[in-house]
Design a protein with these regions (language model features):
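Residues that define the transmembrane beta-barrel architecture of outer-membrane proteins
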Residues: 51-53, 129, 174, 189, ...
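Residues on the lipid-exposed face of transmembrane beta-strands in outer-membrane beta-barrel proteins
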Residues: 57, 212, 226, 247-253, ...
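Transmembrane beta-barrel strands of outer-membrane/channel proteins
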Residues: 59, 90, 106, 122, ...
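Outer-membrane beta-barrel strand-turn architecture
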Residues: 63, 94, 126, 141, ...
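Residue-level detector of the transmembrane beta-barrel scaffold of outer-membrane proteins
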Residues: 71, 87, 103, 119, ...
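Sequence/structural signature of outer-membrane beta-barrel proteins
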Residues: 77-79, 93-95, 109-111, 125-127, ...
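Repeated loop/turn-to-beta-strand initiation elements of outer-membrane beta-barrel proteins
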Residues: 98-100, 114-115, 130-131, 145-146, ...
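Predominantly the C-terminal beta-signal and adjacent terminal strand-loop region
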Residues: 217-220, 255-258, 315, 320-377
């Protein structure tokens, strides 16, 4: 094991030294093929950085001035000029010039520029300029991407005009496509969509933000999340109740068109339903002068954490009247799908349209209402 480690360490040192050779060692002529064990043990010897090849195969590592076809390396490949075609390495591909083809490496790809290239690596891809496609298990970085970046953890680019998909986060200055991340998307300007499991952050969004928890932006008309912190948007706190006296303290936040809703509260009709939680999304239908009209989709869950449970999902129409000083009085009808256990059925205070007992649970479709008061922050 120690011998293998020492051999890999020596190979790594050789790669670093070869990569650091002076820039005057550029390709002088074109060769049909290049075969070797590792630099300089090859058919071209120490002059290999001065040759462009159409076909190269190296058992461990190889160095050339350029490649125009297929280049295969057991561990590492170094190209001091441009690369066209396909590069395949067990560990690392290093291209100093422009990549116009495909790099495939077990660990790491890097290219000076890659305007018409594709980089696929087990860990990391690095490139300057525009790289159409980067796929890695860990991290992608390029100055500009106009097609696809896919990474297990992080994508970063100055400008993205395509799709970024990352398990952890996408980070770009300007996005004109789609950002999809498991946790975080971050951009300065977005002309497209941000979709994340947790947080989206941007300054200006001309599109849609969809997050599992929070959207943050200076300007965003269509943020879809439970909490939306939009600088030029709206934030409201309110107190409301429904036909079952489920009374909630709520926080509504979002842009000029779409907002999110989160709330906590209790039920005054059924004391055992002591703890209530609510979440939803709202659409602004009308907002002018002293009157506004919202349409909300919501889910309400009540429990005592000891077996008593009640849930209600539905839509509600909420006209609101502005009373002055940011105060609004709202109230309107709702269409609710209610669910509870048979032996703990909590009857609706509204009008039951349909009900059924099935598999030990009771479900019903009801007409209800919501009334309350809220304050614009």
């Amino acid at each position: 094991m120690k011998k293998i480690f020492n051999a890999l360490n020596s190979l790594f040192l050789l790669v670093i030294l070869a990569w650091g050779q002076p820039s005057y060692l550029i390709a002088q002529d074109i060769q049909p093929a290049h075969f070797g064990l590792l630099y300089p043990l090859s058919t071209q010897g120490s002059s290999s950085p001065q040759h462009i090849n159409y076909f190269s195969v190296h058992a461990l590592s190889g160095i050339s001035g350029g490649e125009r076809g297929l280049a295969v390396y057991g561990l590492a490949g170094i190209i001091r000029g441009d690369a066209e075609g396909l590069q395949v390495a067990g560990l690392v591909n290093l291209t100093e010039g422009n990549l116009q083809g495909v790099q495939v490496a077990g660990l790491f790809n890097t290219a000076g520029t890659s305007n018409e290239g594709i980089q696929i690596a087990g860990l990391t891809n690095l490139s300057k300029g525009n790289t159409p496609i980067q796929i890695s298990g860990l991290y992608n970085k390029t100055d500009k991407s106009d097609a696809v970046q896919i990474a297990g953890l992080i994508n970063t680019t100055g400008q993205s005009d395509g799709v970024q998909v990352a398990g952890l986060g996408n980070f770009t200055e300007r996005s004109s496509g789609v950002q999809v991340a498991g946790l975080v998307n971050s951009a300065t300007v977005v002309h497209g969509s941000q979709i994340s499991g947790l947080i989206n952050r941007a300054k200006v969004v001309r599109g849609v933000q969809i997050a599992g928890l929070i959207n943050i932006a200076d300007s965003s008309d269509y943020p879809i999340a439970i909490i939306n912190l939009i600088k030029n948007g709206e934030k409201r706190i309110g107190l409301g109740t429904d036909e079952n006296l489920s009374t909630m303290m709520s926080f509504r936040s979002g842009g000029s068109k779409v907002y999110g809703l989160i709330g906590v509260g209790t039920n005054f009709q059924y004391p055992e339903l002591a703890y209530g939680f609510e979440a939803g999304l709202g659409l602004v239908l009308h907002d002018r002068n002293k009157f506004r009209m919202d349409l909300e989709a919501f889910n309400l869950f009540m429990t005592d954490f000891q077996g008593s449970e009640y849930s209600k999902s539905g839509i509600r129409l909420l006209p609101a009247l502005r009373l002055g000083q940011g105060l609004q009085l709202y109230g309107g009808p709702s269409l609710n799908l209610m669910h509870t256990e048979n032996n703990n059925r909590y009857r609706s205070g509204g009008l039951e349209i349909w009900g059924t007992q099935r598999w030990g649970d009771y479900r019903s479709l009801d007409l209800g209402y919501t009334v309350g008061i809220q304050l614009t922050l």
